[in-house]
């Protein structure tokens, strides 16, 4: 293995047990934003009617139509001898796989994962010792060479089978496929390596590791993700909140489009961030005996309160995977952006 690198990221918990305040404080300095909360664009009954629709996942028929695109793309790539010889595996991922996608937004992701390892060492881990313990070795090829070959093969195979006009390979990370007959939406194909994150568990004296994926962008930057842990923790949260977690995620994602239509916001925040902000909220807030309007508002208020704690140690709050810090230095968003979005959503709901 070449270019072993020492990572600075840590292992984090699930963000539970955060103390709740007993009175309302202006944590964010956005007090003036809430002065206009006396009015809402809808009545409570209208909000509840919309939330009843927005919380639903797509129908079985819609699911089949969406998944057809991914199945076609995967079938094309699985038949490629070059990819087979590299030992890649094909794994679905993204909001559709997590069951947090909203209806009429049908994009679906397919991960093409190479077995070559990208090693990240947590602070305090001796790379040479850890690599020796796990038997890691250099394969003689660079990440750039393999990533370039894999991406070129994927793009060429898809263009040959589906037509050049249906393939957009200009993205930094993903190759986008559109126009699959009989399918709805588009398919994003992401090629990546297998990630091993090496760390020493608290109180232990030997190494442990977590597996994820490492994406090498066209600009040479690395993106490290943990999709399997994300799926597992999301499913657990769904169970412990009596199915309310994913319903509220869908509602808030749809609310973002509604907020743009009403001029409350002019730009979107990533759907992934929305999902993580809802995940931070303790389970009992999802299962109160109240209508949908109050439940959504309760969860949004609590999420804003959580990320607005005085002297906040932002590294305490992880993504849903429980590993990466939600507000790490390399994220595409900031805690200020999260404040702004949550406050805007609460403002949009108004007082009914």
Stretches with model-predicted labels:
Residues 1-91, 95-105, 116-137, 321-324:
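N-terminal regions immediately upstream of nucleotidyltransferase
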Residues 86-89, 173, 187, 313-316:
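Residue-level recognition of the N-termini of beta-strands and the immediately preceding loop/turn
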Residues 1-34, 42-51, 249-284, 293-299, ...:
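Long, low-complexity, intrinsically disordered N-terminal extensions of eukaryotic proteins, enriched
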Residues 306-352:
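Histidine-centered catalytic/metal-binding microenvironments
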Residues 110-118, 124, 141-151:
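Internal, well-ordered alpha/beta segment that forms a basic, Gly-enriched binding/recognition surface
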Residues 67, 71-74, 140-291, 295-309, ...:
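Catalytic cores of NTP-dependent nucleotidyl/adenyl transfer enzymes across multiple folds
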Residues 89, 95-115, 176-190:
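Histidine-centered divalent-metal-coordination microenvironment in nucleic-acid enzymes
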């Amino acid at each position: 293995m070449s270019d072993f690198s020492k990572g600075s990221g840590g292992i984090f918990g699930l963000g539970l047990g955060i103390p709740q305040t007993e009175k309302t404080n202006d944590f964010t300095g956005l007090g003036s934003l809430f002065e206009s909360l006396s009015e809402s664009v809808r009545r409570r009954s209208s909000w509840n009617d919309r939330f009843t629709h927005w919380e639903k996942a797509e129908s079985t028929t819609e699911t089949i139509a969406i998944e057809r695109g991914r199945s076609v793309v995967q079938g094309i790539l699985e038949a490629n001898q070059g990819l087979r010889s590299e030992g890649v595996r094909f794994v679905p991922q993204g909001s559709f796989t997590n069951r947090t996608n909203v209806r009429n937004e049908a994009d679906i992701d397919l991960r093409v994962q190479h077995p070559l390892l990208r090693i990240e060492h947590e602070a305090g881990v001796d790379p040479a010792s850890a690599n020796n313990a796990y038997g890691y070795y250099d394969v003689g090829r660079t990440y750039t060479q393999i990533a370039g070959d894999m991406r070129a093969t994927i793009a060429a195979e898809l263009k040959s089978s589906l037509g050049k006009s249906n393939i957009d390979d200009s993205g930094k990370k993903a190759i986008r496929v559109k126009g699959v007959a009989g399918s709805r939406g588009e398919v994003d194909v992401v090629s990546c390596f297998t990630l091993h994150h090496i760390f020493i568990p608290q109180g232990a004296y030997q190494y442990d590791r977590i597996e994820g994926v490492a994406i090498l962008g066209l600009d040479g930057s690395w993106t490290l993700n943990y999709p399997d842990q994300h799926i597992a923790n999301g499913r657990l949260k769904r169970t412990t909140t009596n199915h309310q977690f994913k319903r509220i995620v869908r509602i808030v994602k749809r609310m973002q489009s509604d907020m743009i239509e009403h001029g409350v916001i002019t730009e979107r925040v990533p759907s992934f961030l929305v999902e993580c902000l809802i995940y931070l909220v303790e389970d009992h807030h999802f299962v109160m005996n109240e209508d949908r309007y109050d439940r959504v508002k309760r969860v949004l208020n609590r999420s804003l309160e959580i990320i607005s704690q005085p002297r906040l140690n932002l590294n305490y709050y992880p993504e849903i995977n429980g590993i990466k810090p939600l507000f790490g230095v390399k994220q595409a968003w900031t805690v200020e952006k999260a404040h702004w979005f949550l406050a805007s959503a609460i403002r949009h709901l108004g007082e009914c």
